[in-house]
UniProtKB/Swiss-Prot annotation:
Name this polypeptide is given: Urease accessory protein UreD
Keyword Methyltransferase tagged: no
Subunit organization: UreD, UreF and UreG form a complex that acts as a GTP-hydrolysis-dependent molecular chaperone, activating the urease apoprotein by helping to assemble the nickel containing metallocenter of UreC. The UreE protein probably delivers the nickel.
Gene label: ureD
Single GO cellular component term: cytoplasm
Localization: Cytoplasm
TM annotation in the entry: none
Length: 276
């Protein structure tokens, strides 16, 4: 039996408060809206009761924010891509921001179990004046549990249409990619954090985003396998390779909190669900 599910969540600004409205079909839900930072920022948690995807499953997620709205979206646990008998498992996410909107897209990691055929697509469309901070974290197998990513494949697609496009296909059988110093060098966690603007960042702001990230990276144990770049005037990216998820997640959280403080004047405030 396969699961197909859709979830659409729209953030609007009403009398100084960001309000979330959602629609769903199948096993996808949004938990109660939370306001730990005040009415201006709405925190939401995506829940997928089946707990993972197998071959043939499809999840479609659509999130939007209107002018002046600020939404933060996360998950209570990892997205799990389990073994497939032939059909791929697909997750598609589309984030759409109107002018003046802000969004933080912070799901916990996706875990690719051995034998999976997984695809994870993320598309971000921003109007001029909109800004987004998000990340994408993928674990290949569970090395700490002696469950390696021995066979299977994972396809990743991250795009800001007309601005930035990254595609990757990771096959467990590709020993050069998985083990070569020019590839993943034996690491099993691949992670990216991105700051995306709907129009070009001015030079000072863009450089400050890079400098802030690089200072944090230099002081972190993963400094040899992490870096910050700006592939386009609207995008700044931090990339990390790590043996397991936890150190990569810790590094990205530090940069995320620094960026939201420097550029949005928002105090450090991690989603409560992460501490449960």
């Amino acid at each position: 039996m396969t699961w197909n599910a859709t979830l659409a969540l729209d953030y609007t600004r009403q009398a100084g408060k960001t309000v979330a409205h959602f629609r769903h079909s199948g096993p996808l839900r949004i938990l109660q809206s939370l306001y730990p930072e005040g009415d201006a920022i709405c925190h939401n948690v995506i829940v997928h009761p089946p707990g993972g995807l197998v071959g043939g499953d499809t999840l479609d997620l659509q999130f939007s924010a209107s002018a002046g709205a600020h939404g933060l979206i996360t998950t209570p646990g990892a997205t799990r891509f389990y073994r497939s008998t032939g059909e791929p498992a697909l997750q598609r996410t589309h984030l759409t921001l109107e002018a003046g909107a802000r969004m933080e897209w912070l799901p916990l990691e996706a875990i690719c179990y051995s034998g999976c055929l997984a695809e994870n697509h993320l598309t971000m469309t921003l109007a001029p004046g909109a800004e987004l901070i998000g990340w994408d974290i993928t674990a290949l197998g569970l090395p700490a549990a002696s469950l390696p990513f021995a066979h299977g494949s994972f396809c990743q697609h991250i795009e800001v249409p007309g601005v930035w496009l990254e595609r990757a296909r990771i096959q467990a059988s590709d020993t050069l990619l998985m083990s070569s110093p020019l590839g993943m060098a034996g690491h099993r966690c691949v992670a990216s954090l991105f700051f995306v603007a709907g129009s070009k960042l001015d030079r000072h702001r863009r450089q400050q985003a890079l400098d802030t990230a690089r200072q944090i990276i230099e002081a972190h144990p993963l400094s040899a396998t992490a870096g910050a770049t700006s592939p386009d005037g609207q995008v700044v990216v931090v990339r990390v390779l790590a043996p397991v998820v936890e150190p990569a997640m810790a590094l990205l959280r530090q940069v995320w909190l620094a960026w939201r403080s420097h550029f949005w004047q928002q105090a450090a405030s991690s989603p409560r669900i992460w501490s449960m």
